[in-house]
């Protein structure tokens, strides 16, 4: 997992500068899909959640499709971690995608206590799981 230049404050300011009060988080298996900015705020807002992972994907991305079953399996294996996904083409979340500096797919962003702590960019399930274990400690 890499720590990069994404600033938690930039992400939070992006959320704060919206008037979206709608919550539409949809749960598929043990991974919840974030659809609105309010969903994103809700996902990160509870600092007691511990580790939160967000998978940025698109429906046409081959590597995203390949790792999706592994991501679901990891969500079931690590129940103390909160697993989410965001379609990077969702226009409602374009500001979040930009603030998180998503330039390659899939990208998994890691947050702890509401703060950005790093990312894993690859469709490698072994590497992703290693990053989850390391970030959980």
From Swiss-Prot:
Write down a Pfam family by its short name: Thioredoxin
Site Deprotonates C-terminal active site Cys: give positions. Answer: 55
Q: Which domain of life is it from?
A: Viruses
Q: Where is this site: Contributes to redox potential value?
A: 62-63
Q: Where is the active site?
A: 61 (nucleophile), 64 (nucleophile)
- Tell me which residues make up the Thioredoxin domain: 2-137
Give the disulfide map: 61-64
Going by the UniProt record, its keywords in alphabetical order are: Disulfide bond, Electron transport, Redox-active center, Transport
DNA-binding among the record's keywords?
A: no
Asked if Disulfide bond is a keyword of the record, the answer is: yes
Function recorded in the entry: Participates in various redox reactions through the reversible oxidation of its active center dithiol to a disulfide and catalyzes dithiol-disulfide exchange reactions.
Family to which this protein belongs: Belongs to the thioredoxin family.
What is the protein named? Answer: Thioredoxin-like protein R548
User: What is the source species?
Assistant: Acanthamoeba polyphaga mimivirus (APMV)
